[in-house]
Amino acid sequence: MTEPTTGKRRADAVRNVEAIVEAVLNGGIVGGELNMAAVARLAGVSRVTLYSHFPSRQSLVEAAVDRAIAESEQLVEELRLDLDPPPVALDRFVSSSWRMVDKYHSLYTAATTELPTGRLTALHGPLLGRMRTLILRGRRDGSFRTDLSVDWLVATAFSLMHQAAEEVEAGRLSARKAGSVISATLLPVLRRE
């Protein structure tokens, strides 16, 4: 008799966690800050329920970043970048990634406040790994430079993407043009001289 109740609670808990993370991604961050009361309200749960699943702002931001990155990974997977020459694949990767950075720019702002830099970078690991693979493929076919470390080039791409988000936030760069600006900046950095 207790198993169905436990199973129901687990299903409710899963639904609550999903609703809470969705609330963060869809309006729970205001002015770059996570508002726990707003998240609870948007998720349709009490603050007690919110804190029972996410005891800290950091844990909630981390879960939301993880979800946003999983969504980004799915989009990148659908691009089938291995079918394009590396420069074309890079442009498509940047364009797709930019759409996600722009969509979740408030989350990124909150994450830079709530999460240690190393943790934020680690959460981006799968996407950084895809960028690394793409750069290595470009090196093998002669499209991309070999005089700088791959780690440096990946870090440069990651930083450039997020700097563009800050420029958009500050009103110095159009969100609509940012993807092409990032590609126009990054491709010359990567190209073999």
Each PLM stretch: what is its role?
Residues M1-L42, S59:
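Basic, helix-initiating cap at the start of DNA-binding domains
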Residues A63, Q74-K103, P116, G179:
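Hydrophobic alpha-helical connector segments
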